From Swiss-Prot:
Top-level enzyme category: translocase
Gene name tied to this protein: hmuV
Localization per Swiss-Prot or TrEMBL: Cell inner membrane
GO molecular function terms listed in the Swiss-Prot or TrEMBL record: ATP binding; ATP hydrolysis activity
Function: Part of the ABC transporter complex HmuTUV involved in hemin import. Responsible for energy coupling to the transport system.
UniProt protein name: Hemin import ATP-binding protein HmuV
Membrane topology: Peripheral membrane protein
Sequence positions that bind ATP: G37, P38, N39, G40, A41, G42, K43, S44
Classification of source organism: Bacteria, Pseudomonadati, Pseudomonadota, Alphaproteobacteria, Hyphomicrobiales
Annotated source species: Rhodopseudomonas palustris (strain BisB18)
Subunit architecture: The complex is composed of two ATP-binding proteins (HmuV), two transmembrane proteins (HmuU) and a solute-binding protein (HmuT).
Annotated keywords: ATP-binding, Cell inner membrane, Cell membrane, Membrane, Nucleotide-binding, Translocase, Transport
One GO cellular component term noted in the UniProt record for this chain: plasma membrane
Amino acid sequence: MSGFLDAEAASFAIGGATLLDRIDLRIDRGELIAIVGPNGAGKSTLLRLLSGDLRPTRGAVSLQQRAIHSYAPRELASRRAMLSQHVNVSFPFTVEEVVWMGAGDRGRGTSQSLVDAALHEVGLDAFRDRQLPTLSGGEQQRAHFARVLVQLRCGEVEHGPGLLLLDEPTSSLDLRHQIDLAGTARRCARNGTTVIAILHDINLAARFADRIVVLHQGRLAADGAPSQVIENSLIRRVFDIALVVRTAEDGVPFLLPQMIDAARPQSEG
């Protein structure tokens, strides 16, 4: 049985180098998937395959049981929204104007409430009239996240919950805003949006994701519930570091480098 988004033996090669090798994934509607792995593992390439930006050199990617490359660009844009890791805007747009870009050519009366809601959701209500280049990197990242939220929600009016793809969305954010953004992504998933996010922080992934997909050297190394992946000894080999598993008070497992764990004060018995 197919999922909302499927990769079937999907591979991608360029210049004789295989960046992804026979990736099989079934992602159901409303799942929040975190993709983790060391640098160069193929995470961004996989996200671009799943978004339809890249075509697999072998295998297939399908969205709602239809080859993702069979969608016309405008049709695909109304069904999925993607936040890239680095977005450069050199023109002096205001924050609100950037967020409005997510609405495309839809009328202002139709989408103003979506823009207002997105600005509020990312905590930029008071920044709407600021020029984007005057903001910090983290604030700019939040503005672009609001933009893709508007794009996603405009598409929902036509097609129902869509696909949200996030490439290192927390890379420029402080801890508070990392948690806020991850919480927003989780709420999107609970409302039916299918969310796929590349994260460097596997503990953040364990806290918010339904599943963690681990890539290593272009191959699928693990795919499962956060607790299964965190507690799998394979994760130490993938990241090539000594890690220990600990459990938070609410039962969620997390990883610590062994040298940090050894330095923690031991509780008195």
